Amino acid sequence: MSSFVADRIVMDGLTFDDVLLIPAYSEVLPRTVELKTKFSRNIDLNIPFVTAAMDTVTESAMAIAIAREGGIGVIHKNMSIEEQARQVAIVKRAENGMIYDPVTIRRGSTVGEALDMMAEYHIGGIPVVDDDNHLVGIVTNRDLRFELNHDRNVDEVMTSENLVTTHIKTDLAAAANILQENKIEKLPVVDSENHLVGLITYKDITKAKDKPMACKDDKGRLRVAAGVGVTADTLDRMQALVNAGADAIVIDTAHGHSKYVIEKLVEAKKSFPNVDIVVGNVATGAAAKMLVDNGADAVKVGIGPGSICTTRVVAGVGMPQLSAVYDVASALEGTGVPLIADGGLRYSGDVVKALAAGGYSVMIGSLVAGTEESPGDTIIFNGRKFKSYRGMGSLEAMENGSKDRYFQAGTKDVKKLVPEGIAGRVPYKGTLQEVIYQLVGGLRSGMGYCGANTISDLHSAKFVRITNAGVLESHPHDISITSEAPNYSRPE
């Protein structure tokens, strides 16, 4: 006699509230643990946090902030190709050892044009060059601050006499001395024929000292990734993003174990063999292995665990997140390809569990959607400050460009869309730096309890399955909270 349980139920699935990590003998202090990990095959992170490619989570401000903390942000795709490329370029220009392709203005341009460029790129000075890229001067906001005639030629207001420059082999320490001695903030770098080849700024040197753990490329620029879908213009979008300096491309779909996603992955690796391609989302080891066999440099894991996702309810499909992470981690063992645990994280303890189950990094959305740097609208409700937060499968996000993520790109009539997410609001939390500090602190603490000095060590930690009573016991109980902690609020 056939049995539904025996024939069709293949496994039990567990998620964060179903388990706890078992404390182990430890010689590890939380403050000394090593958090360096891999985002993708060729990109390292100094902390295992990735901000989600969502239109209420990651644009340039968020990507800059998380990279400065040591993680990486994925710029969402709900915008034009040109705008997404511009967002990437802003991140790549935000911080540099030396700016290898500085924004310049041509001799003969106007003060108004210089001011527009400064506003667009958020910079305080621009080298002035001739048609052959010879450096002829530099114009800064100090030169323009009291200039009322915006039609005036920049040649008349720029600094050109006794212009301080340096050569390409100057290191940052020597550059800092030159800037200090001459009381200037920007140091143009020129070759033997006075062609402009770069720019070193005092602000960048200061930032490098203030944020030594920042996630940077080999040129000292902040790292950033960008999301794409599976559409007719995917390769065009990728080309623009790569040209803008994107360090990795994330092919972001609701179902990565799909013929169309794999075909796009193969095309992408053929067109951009030197760019890391991250692909998701999946929930099984078989899916992850297929993506890796076709060239994926990292795999994103999570079908339906997010706080704003309704896929499991609408489609009846998914996998409890911890089981999904473990299944994928087991399948990818020995491949050198890391996995990103995406979704379902409510507390720093969930981050520890996701990494212990096999994750190399975690993708966070709701945990940072309430920060100052998120692009969500600020809302005042009942005297409290909130920020808007929505799933990319929500009706509102799908109308703005994320239909292809759910394989509904051809649906023109809004009433015919089938959403797999909702829109809402989350409490305002302050700056990203404050939130990441608490998340990193919780992760360090968890690693200390497990005796894990590295995230790789944490992969060997043991779990205990708990009951609902165990969950209740884990939270504060039998008390009225009178003073909230910065890293805990009661589950709603």
Can you say where each PLM-predicted feature lies in the sequence?
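Alpha/beta catalytic cores of nucleotide-metabolism and tRNA/nucleoside-modifying enzymes
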Residues: M1-Y25, I105-R106, H167, G227, ...
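Bateman/CBS regulatory modules and CBS-like beta-alpha motifs in cytosolic regions of diverse proteins
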Residues: L29-L45, A52-M54, E83-Y121, V128-D130, ...
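Active-site-adjacent beta->alpha loops and helix N-cap segments on the catalytic face
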Residues: R31, S80-A89, E147-D151, D171, ...
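Short beta-strand/loop segments at the ligand-binding rim of alpha/beta enzyme cores
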Residues: D44-T51, G97-P102, E161, D217-G227, ...
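Catalytic cores of alpha/beta
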Residues: A61-I64, D236-A244, I277, A283-V301, ...
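Glycine-rich phosphate-binding active-site loops on the catalytic face of alpha/beta enzymes
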Residues: R68-E83, A246-S258, D297-A315, L345-I379
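Catalytic beta/alpha-barrel core
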Residues: V74-N78, T104-I105, G125-P127, T165-H167, ...
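Short beta->alpha transition motifs characteristic of CBS
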Residues: I75-S80, I123, P127, L135-H150, ...
